[in-house]
Amino acid sequence: MSANIRKKGELLVPLPIVLVTSFSCHRNKNQLLLIFAAKVRNNWDFLYFRSKFVNTMIRRAEIKDIPGIIELLHQVNMVHYVLRPDLFKPYTTKYKEQELETLIDDDSKPIFVFEDGAVLGHAFCMITEVKDDKLLQDIKTLYIDDICVDEKARGKHVGKALYEYVRDYAQSIGCNNITLNVWDGNDAALSFYKNMGMKVQKTTMEIVL
């Protein structure tokens, strides 16, 4: 079986002839690669695509990222406000600039950002550890306090890349699990986390009086 290598974008990468039934997404520290295989005129054409995200990086947040993070926090808050205007105030953020400056240096509450010339996504995390508890087993947990993708970058797998980065980070520091909360009615977020393999741990009940 012969293989023709077709260039799409800036790079041309020779690939071994393998059986590929669909596309695959490959990530390194600087770029996302999409590789497709298609049978054309009885030959296999391997189409190499350089992702739109050419200079992407997921890393710990820095002071310079604060304006972008605040913009994302506004987007998150508006989602929550639309869901529960009886609980959330509009046009505000969970953290202010000074609070973010402190959080950025807190290793127990790491903030990660997805950068592509601008901050396109963030993940606020908290590391907690239970030891010698009367009821609970010893356990180290990474809690995702907030994860957001810029509304202009949604549908481009930014959230998936962020989540997988956080998952790998949690494993690297010896966490036993990852937890987070999803508001009822936020169906898109619930579906996303289920697709990432997460399952319901507990349910918070409410009655409004």
Regions found by a protein language model. Name each.
Residues 57-71:
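A short beta-loop-alpha structural element at the N-terminal edge
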Residues 78-100:
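Conserved GNAT-fold acetyl-CoA-binding loop/helix
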Residues 98-112, 143:
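A short helix-loop-beta-strand connector motif used in the catalytic cores of GNAT acetyltransferases and
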Residues 113, 118-127, 148:
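Conserved beta-strand in the GNAT
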Residues 137-151, 206:
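Conserved acetyl-CoA binding element of GNAT-fold acetyltransferases
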Residues 146, 150-164, 171-173, 184-191, ...:
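Conserved glycine-rich acetyl-CoA-binding loop
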Residues 175, 194-203:
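Conserved acetyl-CoA-binding loop of GNAT-fold acetyltransferases
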Residues 179-189, 206-209:
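Conserved beta-strand-loop-alpha-helix junction that forms the acyl-donor binding cleft
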